Amino acid sequence: MSRTRIVIGISTAVGVAAALGVMAAPTAGAQAHGHDGRFTVVADHLNNPRGLSPAPGGGLYLAEAGRGGKPCVSGGPEGETCAGLSGSFDLITKGGHVKRIITGLISASGPGGVAAIGPVSVSRGPRGTFYGLFGLNTHVIPPKGAIPDNVRTKALAQLGRLWLVKPGAWVKTVSNVGDQDWAWTKRHSDLGPTDWPDANPNAVLFSHGSRYVADAGANALVRVKWNGNARVLHYLAMPANFEGDSVATCVARGPDGALYVGELLGGFYSPEHARIWRVTAHHATVWAGGLTTVQGCGFGSDGAFYATEFQTDGLTAQNPAGDVVRISQNGERTRLGVGKLFQPSGFAAGPDGSIYVSNCSIAPATGMGPQLCPTGGQVVRLG
């Protein structure tokens, strides 16, 4: 299934949940136990906050997917898609002040600014730089005349792109990874689902001098070479009798040097089917299973693996509650943020042992109603 339809389609269930006041805590699997811990809102009133990355000085880089814009045109997952220039790449200081480094970026959402797609991920680079990633690809852009020319021009220049952002907000386009992944799925249509060709870059990682992208539409881990060419390192195959895609959503470097890639679905919409893949230069294996709707992942300073679960009861459930699953080095699982996280997405680890998560990640700054994310998107600290 197209990652575009997955994310924006969620907002229908979210709206129902808000209307019904469904705010129950998620059901914890038998293999994990809960732990409340400290919960602190670092920043709120954010527009669809997604990927996070540590920044110099104890701050955080953040990708805000924006709140869409006007006009809204027919043909979107909810009947309409509202495109605008409300996305941004941000710096959240150690004191919680949000500095929007680059603004006016492409953003497409459902009506009301919910479940926007635009800037989706960030990763700290060398010498004060960071990488910024946009979702989708240019093949999804409507024809000339369907949306304002300035919005369409930005969409053509930004969707599916990987940027390097240098001090002073100087930007260099590193790769059109989304379009290259789309072309790869077209060439390999025998591997994937019926809606291929498709591509939707969802997470970027700069590590050991290389750039990696988890593509939710192509179901693949991709390496972006220094000439901008995108090379698929591993395709996340669906299991037998699958109902949906694997949907690669996050990538992290482990203490052992391997790459770890998380899935949203793992081939099924019901809970506890998402997997974490361990990828080395020679092979890829499923390292962990039994997770649900993984959106962000990474390793903490304690060596444990963390995964944000977007909706713990499953993608099609009306309950918007999510959590973070901690997998210790001995395999023990603990759930964090239970009853406090709703559609969490991005993950970053702090050097002090705290972890940071983008919460209410499909909410505009104005929220989604009095009972669901009333202060809009957030970045929160656990621990």
Show the residue positions of the predicted features:
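Secretory targeting and sorting signals
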Residues: M1-Q31
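Extracellular beta-propeller repeat domains
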Residues: G29-G383
